Design a protein with these regions (language model features):
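A short alpha-helical cap/connector motif
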Residues: 1-145, 152-173, 177-187
Length: 187
């Protein structure tokens, strides 16, 4: 078991590094390493909290990009389910491909990362279908963690919607809050 765990982590680490290179070479913004470290610590703490009650955790991510954050979070524990929304069809397709590639060695991220394509405002507020016809019922779920990494000028709007989707002990993480002043100007 120990050997399989090490192989799995080595594969994921290697693949995530390839994703980082792709993001840099193609000017795709992904979460910074320091920020990711904090996010992963928060996810690990939530997993520990929920283990006491024998429950998994649900994460909502706005802004999938290439799937880098989703894969990182999902790889922590097999009891993590992620709903992630991406507006760009190009990014959605890249993320889907990345998630399928990393879905090996018993980590099963593909079945625990639910990807949706479309406008987050619509998909967050009503039971509907996304742009590829997949049923979306995010508005009726409760989340342990919401990670907002989408259109920076809309953070306050996203926050106001997402706070109603949190469990009582849930947390919202906003990436790049100081990004070029887009978020601060709204406050």
């Amino acid at each position: 078991m120990e050997e399989r765990y090490i192989r799995r982590n080595d594969y994921i680490t290697k693949y995530l590094k390839e994703m980082e290179v792709f993001a840099k070479n193609n000017n795709v913004p992904i979460v910074r390493k320091q920020t990711l470290s904090v996010i992963l610590d928060l996810v690990k703490n939530k997993v520990k909290e929920k283990e006491k009650n024998k429950k998994g955790i649900r994460i909502l991510e706005l802004g999938t990009a290439i799937g880098y954050s989703s894969i990182n979070m999902a790889s922590i524990d097999n009891n993590i389910v992620i709903d992630t929304i991406e507006k760009s069809k190009k990014m959605y397709d890249i993320a889907k491909n990345n998630i399928e590639k990393v879905d090996i060695c018993e980590i099963d991220v593909k079945n625990r990362i639910n990807m949706y394509l479309g406008d987050a405002f619509k998909l967050l507020q009503e039971t509907t279908e996304d742009e590829i016809g997949k049923k979306v019922d995010i508005c009726n779920n409760k989340y342990d963690i919401v990670f907002i990494d989408a259109n920076k000028s809309k953070y306050l709007d996203y926050f106001n919607i997402c706070k109603n989707l949190l469990n009582d002990d849930g947390i919202i993480i906003l990436d790049n809050v100081l990004f070029l002043g887009y978020v601060l100007r709204r406050l």
